[in-house]
């Protein structure tokens, strides 16, 4: 018989994972609250990258259904930079990133927050642009407003996603249903872990022309 994971057990496991994660400098500064499998993180961290690391660590704990990341980024004095310096570094980082249409992406910086705008053909290009700037010193957050242009018909998108799900060793494809509306993909069905749910979403995003994925897959633990 499977052991029932209570919210108290889940909170302890998340706290233990945060303490174990080397990318988190001060785990004691992070508050963890759990209700019905939903984890809320509060408190502060020293960088945007650390904020994302904490979120990923919490999501990786068995039994976690979702994470609300309310962590505040408080930059130490040594990491504080002007918006002009951040913009210069961000522009250079984008210049060095392979596979993205650099001339189609614009950026702005306000109080340490980097905003990305423009158009790309593939979702991975949108992600790559964000990955290029989010770890830069002084960055408090990234607002990714880059749009993915639809490139193929919805029937082709659905077919490609169905085939990709079947190829994935991590998933039971027969448990997942794919619906397409224009360039939007809706995923339904059941999986046994958050990682499987995220993997199905990742697969869907790989299809050309996808601009939105609504992941309604239910995690059954």
Please tell me what each predicted stretch does.
Residues 1-221:
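N-terminal targeting leaders
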């Amino acid at each position: 018989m499977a052991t029932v994971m209570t919210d108290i057990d889940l909170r302890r496991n998340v706290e233990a994972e945060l303490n174990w994660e080397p990318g988190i400098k001060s785990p004691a500064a992070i508050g963890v609250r759990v209700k019905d499998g939903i984890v809320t993180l509060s408190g502060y961290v020293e960088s945007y990258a650390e904020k994302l690391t904490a979120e990923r660590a919490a999501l990786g704990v068995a039994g976690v259904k979702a994470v609300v990341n309310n962590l505040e980024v408080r930059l130490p004095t040594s990491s504080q930079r002007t918006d002009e310096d951040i913009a210069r570094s961000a522009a250079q980082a984008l210049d060095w990133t392979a596979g993205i249409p650099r001339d189609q992406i614009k950026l702005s910086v306000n109080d340490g927050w980097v905003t990305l705008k423009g158009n790309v053909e593939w979702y991975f290009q949108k992600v790559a642009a964000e990955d290029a700037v989010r770890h830069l010193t002084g960055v408090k957050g990234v607002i990714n407003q880059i749009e993915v242009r639809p490139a193929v018909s919805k029937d082709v998108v659905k077919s490609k996603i169905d085939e990709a799900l079947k190829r994935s060793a991590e998933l039971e494809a027969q448990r997942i249903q794919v619906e397409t509306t224009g360039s939007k993909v809706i995923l339904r069905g059941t999986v046994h872990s958050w990682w499987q749910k995220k993997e199905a979403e990742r697969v869907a995003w790989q299809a050309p022309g996808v601009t939105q994925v609504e992941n309604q897959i239910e995690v059954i633990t």
